[in-house]
């Protein structure tokens, strides 16, 4: 068989040296050695070949936090940018649809979305369950979950009520909730106790709200997915290390990339992934946390090199050494790769 594209001699994490062939926009074959019968053959010996990266928590919509993904996507290998709550029911129509990258969305339970820095769920009139359900069902292919930010500034005296409403919407539509945890009140345990298997807690190792106690362990054991969500203040090495030691390894790694984190401390998804390597997580596990795991969490057809899957690929040059990386609180560790 003749292929459209053959990536020859690359290293697939957890598998080893492989050739990857593409035909008709799909992955046609993956094997230790394939015939050099392709319209284009690219020698990627010594390079890392992965599915296109899937960033589960970004902000690419209009508003206070939003950035343009296009200038960053090409050199970071991130082909799927999940917009995590920039838009609510009032503003979803203004959220960009991907051209060069895919932009699935998590609908903010607050209909105003993230038009400002915070406070979107202080007025419960904006957390309209029926309107949110209607919005999801009208755009179900794009809207893959519900986003709720729970911290003192965002919800004010409303506590976990916005989360309860988000969970009602999610249950009605058969989708997960991603909840941002931050400064109490409400307490992080009160938030975790409400989450269902398949729901996502982002900023899981923030150092601000640190899920480390019995409620966190119980949530992790029942299938609540822990997501890094680095951002400008959402990641602390010491908290992540304690979680890993307790058996609460994060399921997904994401950047929470936005206008206040893109120039540091998060920078981009490969840089954030290197920080997981710096605490001792294996490369293959870190790659999975940035590809197949976020895709599974939202039911996306992405994140895999399986034959027949879309030919959504990334190729990385990898340098071995000792590279200092910093979290959001200026703690540093040493990563073995970049």
Which residue ranges define each predicted feature?
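Hydrophobic faces of well-ordered beta-strands that scaffold small-molecule active sites
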Residues: 52-60, 81-83, 103-107, 144-148, ...
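C-terminal cap of metal-dependent C-N hydrolases
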Residues: 310-338
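Divalent-metal coordination cores built from histidine and acidic residues
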Residues: 71-151
